[in-house]
């Protein structure tokens, strides 16, 4: 009791198991001080009752929480007995080594600083501790036990964590910097590294013989570590969920992988591609793999420019491949006649053991180069005798299943294949068809409605003879090839409506109802279909088109010109055109175009019932092309149209009229 301090000297052990009330510090110079509660160290307040390790050790044989800080003025050891747990406020080791021993748990709740820590046994939990080492030795030496690091900053000039015994390392939201290895394992060690809320790019080295490192990447984790292992050691990786990421920036060798997260090959550095080599088995838990790939002809090994996943064992489950495309694209069917071959294209995944056909699949229907090439690259699977062993990237083990990107073709049954089917020789005769025009009616002086339905008739016969397989092109291309006909049909749809309106002027003039100034508006619609005179093998696409528009116009002036009456006006029509390419399930697309048409109109009516109608129009078109799921391309176009119509109306009996044009 009193205001003094307790100083432990001598090599023996001293035990404090009661309640002490001294107010000063506790300092251990030599030997060991044994305690079973925080009250054993006196009753001083937090500011003047710290524990100072001055060369001796602290042995804890009870469970308790202390608000004291622990200072090290020399190397020191804190031991916690089995089944006991002791927590402290902060530790400050300076340049000295702090050793945790005993089978119990020691917790540092509120950080502090340390330069070298050794875990001999039991569990050590460090929360918000700043650890920095300029020493040649590792910052954290783990012989046995469980090391939990939560928050804080950890940096080391040399190795960060050196593991010499069976242990578990748990990292949660720790800032890590290491000039050496982030983690290094010695011989005959089995260790588990678990990560949560963690980004780490520390190198991992498993150099010892018969050592095993199991890595569990959990919630909100990105593992960007380069991994290196000896032939006698094992690294097993488990990406536990879809917020678990593994970034690969160089060739990486591991033994077994379970992927319920995301494996990401980092963007190319100087056009260098990387391999993930898996010595054992791979299990896909609906995870993803992102690879960088040059879309080219492929074929020869040195032309298959892509990151690769190479698995010597078996594959289970399913995995989605996300290909980041580069290059200008090319037709991978390089054999004479474009006959498909297992050597063509670009290998992404090779398996030495067994794998189902759907073990790997693309995240989309096909891969393309965007605007650089029209080809569809799809993923095809080869197995057993189908595999071209000249494309073997597994080394000494034959490839049993090969997943390759190749140019997609259609065979005689409509199936997607990676080249020309030699049996694809059935003939076809088709009649071609052309564009259709809508027919509609409108009524009213100033308002009106128009509706129409049209079916186009072609101008010639389709190709005859042998059908030939051909490459599939990207879906937006079918809309691009249909776009001129679709926009022409929409333009005719607008002009036809304006021409009908100009015809109203002539009718009103004959009935003496015409006005020098007249305003009108009407809603118009049409449904049309188009059938190409080319067959599908020659990229002939059929489509259905739905047009809707609002037409607003005026005749702003009229004047006499000799024996003629002249009317001048303007029209603005806005609407949309929806076009659905229908005759190719593998290349179908849907196009929505918003249109704005500005027109100047003129009508000349002769006293002898002759008339001339003229329309000069400018159209602006903006829209998008869709596949089954999303927007895939944009449409932007414009047009100029000139329409001149000459006619005369003849009156027949019983109020019948005939009007040649």
Task: Describe these PLM feature segments.
Residues 423-424, 428, 458-658:
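Outer membrane beta-barrel translocator domains of Type V secretion systems
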Residues 336-352, 359-542:
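Interface/linker segment at the passenger-translocator junction
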Residues 1-46, 74-131, 179, 184-187, ...:
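Extracellular repeat-rich scaffold modules on cell surfaces
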Residues 3, 53-62, 68, 73, ...:
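Extracellular beta-solenoid/beta-roll
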Residues 43, 298-301, 562, 653-654:
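Short glycine/serine/proline-enriched coil/turn segments at secondary-structure junctions
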């Amino acid at each position: 009791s009193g205001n003094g301090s307790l100083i432990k000297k001598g090599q023996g052990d001293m035990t404090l198991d009661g309640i002490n009330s001294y107010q000063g510090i506790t300092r251990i110079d030599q030997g060991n001080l044994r305690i079973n509660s925080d009250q054993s160290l006196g009753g001083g307040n937090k500011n003047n009752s710290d524990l100072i390790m001055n060369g001796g050790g602290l042995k804890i044989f009870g469970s308790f929480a202390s608000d004291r800080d622990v200072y090290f003025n020399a190397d020191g050891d804190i031991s916690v007995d089995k089944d006991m747990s002791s927590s402290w406020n902060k530790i400050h080791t300076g340049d000295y080594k702090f050793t945790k021993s005993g089978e119990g748990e020691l917790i540092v709740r509120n950080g502090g600083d340390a330069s070298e820590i050794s875990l001999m046994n039991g569990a050590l939990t460090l929360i918000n501790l700043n650890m920095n080492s300029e020493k040649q030795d590792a910052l954290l030496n783990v012989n046995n036990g469980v090391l939990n690091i939560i928050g804080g900053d950890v940096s080391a000039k040399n190795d960060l964590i050196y593991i010499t015994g069976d242990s578990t390392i748990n990292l949660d939201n720790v800032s890590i910097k290491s000039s050496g290895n982030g983690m290094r394992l010695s011989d005959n060690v089995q260790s588990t590294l678990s990560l949560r809320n963690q980004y780490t790019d520390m190198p991992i080295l498993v150099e010892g013989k018969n050592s095993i490192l199991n890595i569990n990447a959990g919630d909100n984790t990105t593992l960007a570590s380069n991994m290196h292992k000896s032939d006698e050691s094992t690294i097993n990786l488990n990406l536990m969920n879809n917020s678990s990421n593994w970034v690969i920036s160089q060739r990486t060798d591991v033994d077994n992988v379970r992927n319920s997260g995301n494996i990401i090959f980092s963007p190319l550095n100087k056009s260098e591609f990387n391999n993930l080599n898996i010595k054992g088995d791979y299990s896909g838990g609906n995870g993803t793999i992102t690879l960088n790939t040059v879309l080219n002809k492929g074929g020869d090994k040195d032309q298959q420019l892509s990151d690769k996943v190479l698995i010597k064992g078996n594959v289970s489950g399913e995995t989605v491949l996300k290909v980041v495309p580069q290059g200008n694209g090319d037709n991978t069917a390089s054999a004479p006649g474009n006959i498909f071959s297992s050597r063509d294209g670009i290998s992404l995944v090779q398996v030495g053991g067994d794998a189902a056909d759907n073990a790997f699949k693309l995240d989309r229907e096909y891969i393309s180069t965007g605007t650089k090439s029209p080809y569809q690259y799809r993923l095809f699977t080869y197995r057993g005798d189908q595999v071209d062993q000249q494309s073997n990237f597994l080394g000494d083990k034959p490839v049993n299943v090969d997943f390759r990107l190749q140019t997609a073709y259609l065979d005689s049954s409509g199936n997607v294949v990676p080249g020309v089917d030699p049996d694809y020789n059935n003939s076809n005769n088709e009649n071609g068809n052309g564009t259709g025009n809508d027919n509609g009616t409108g009524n009213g002086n100033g308002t009106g409605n128009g509706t129409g339905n049209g079916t186009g008739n072609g101008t010639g016969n389709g190709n005859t003879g042998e059908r030939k397989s051909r490459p599939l092109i990207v879906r937006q291309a079918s809309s691009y090839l249909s776009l001129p006909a679709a926009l022409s049909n929409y333009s005719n749809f607008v002009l036809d409506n304006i021409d009908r309106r100009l015809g109203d002027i002539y009718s009103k003039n004959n009935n003496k109802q015409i006005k020098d100034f007249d305003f009108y508006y009407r809603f118009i619609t049409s449904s049309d279909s188009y059938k190409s005179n080319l067959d599908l093998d020659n990229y002939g696409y059929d489509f259905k088109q739905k047009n809707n528009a609002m037409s607003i116009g005026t005749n702003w002036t009229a004047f006499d010109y000799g024996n003629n009456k002249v009317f001048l006006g303007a029209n603005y029509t806005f609407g949309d055109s929806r076009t659905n390419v229908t005759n190719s399930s593998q290349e179908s697309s849907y196009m929505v175009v918003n249109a704005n048409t500005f027109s100047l109109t003129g009508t000349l009516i002769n006293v002898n019932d002759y008339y001339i109608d003229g329309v000069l129009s400018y159209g602006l078109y903006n829209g998008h092309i869709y596949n089954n799921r999303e927007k895939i391309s944009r449409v932007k176009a414009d047009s100029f149209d000139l329409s001149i119509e000459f006619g005369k109306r003849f009156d027949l009996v019983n109020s019948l009229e005939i009007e040649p044009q």
